[in-house]
Amino acid sequence: MTVMNLFFRPCQLQMGSGPLELMLKRPTQLTTFMNTRPGGSTQIRFISGNLDPVKRREDRLRKIFSKSRLLTRLNKNPKFSHYFDRLSEAGTVPTLTSFFILHEVTAILPLFLLWWLLYNLDLSDDFKLPNFLNGLMDSCHTAMEKFVGKRYQECLNKNKLILSGTVAYVTVKLLYPVRIFISIWGAPYFGKWLLLPFQKLKHLIKK
C-alpha cells in the first residue's frame, strides 16, 4: 500500500459553477475547504470512502434479488417484508451458508428417521411403489445396496434393510420441493443464529 493510498480518500472538487470529481483519497475524519483568488473559488470536499456495513449488505442482496423475477416480486410485496428484513440482517454469506446446511439437514434427518421406522415395520419383500416411480426406485435401490454392502449382514436383515432404505430414499427425493422451500424460508433465521458466536467472539476481542 503506497503513502498516497494510505492518506487520501475520494474527494469532490467544486470549481466555479460545476463540480469536478477527483479520485483522491484521504482519511474520512478530515474535510478541507480551499478558497483561491483571483478567478473565483475552488472548494475541495472530501467524501467518506467507508460505507455502512448494513448498507453494503443490502446493496449486495438487491443485486442478487434483481437477477430473479420471483424474488423481485416477493421483495415488493408487503406480506414478505418481514422475511426480507431478516434476510438483510443476516447478510448474504451467512444466508447462503445456512441454506446449504438446511438443505443437507432436511435430507439426512428424514432419510435415517424414515429408514429406521420402515425397517421396524413389517414391510413385505414384494412391496412396490407406483409404476411411474420404477426408474427412481431402481436407482435408489442400487445406491442403497452399495451403501449397506456387507457390513450389516450379521445383525440385521440385509434385504429388509435395503428395501426400507430404498423406500426412505425415494420419499426424501420426492420431498425435494418441500426441502427447498424450508431451506429458503429458514435460511435468514438460521443465518442470524449462525452469526451469534462470531459476534460474541468479536465483542470479546474488542474488550
From Swiss-Prot:
Q: Name one Pfam family in it.
A: FLILHELTA
Alphabetized, the UniProt keywords read:
Membrane, Mitochondrion, Mitochondrion inner membrane, Transit peptide, Transmembrane, Transmembrane helix
State the annotated membrane topology for this chain: Multi-pass membrane protein
Q: What is this protein called?
A: MIOREX complex component 11
Report the transit peptide positions: 1-46
- Family statement drawn from the similarity comment of this UniProt entry: Belongs to the MRX11 family.
Q: Does the keyword Cell cycle apply?
A: no
Which stretches of this protein does UniProt put in the Mitochondrial matrix compartment?
47-98, 199-207
Q: Which PANTHER family match?
A: MIOREX COMPLEX COMPONENT 11
One GO term describing the cellular component: mitochondrial outer membrane
Complexes and interactors: Associates with the mitochondrial ribosome.
What species does this protein belong to? Saccharomyces cerevisiae (strain ATCC 204508 / S288c) (Baker's yeast)
User: Has the keyword Transmembrane been applied to this entry?
Assistant: yes
Segments crossing the lipid bilayer: 99-119, 178-198
The UniProt function text for this chain reads:
Component of MIOREX complexes, large expressome-like assemblies of ribosomes with factors involved in all the steps of post-transcriptional gene expression.
Q: What subcellular locations does the record give?
A: Mitochondrion; Mitochondrion inner membrane
Q: Which residues lie on this side of the membrane: Mitochondrial intermembrane?
A: 120-177
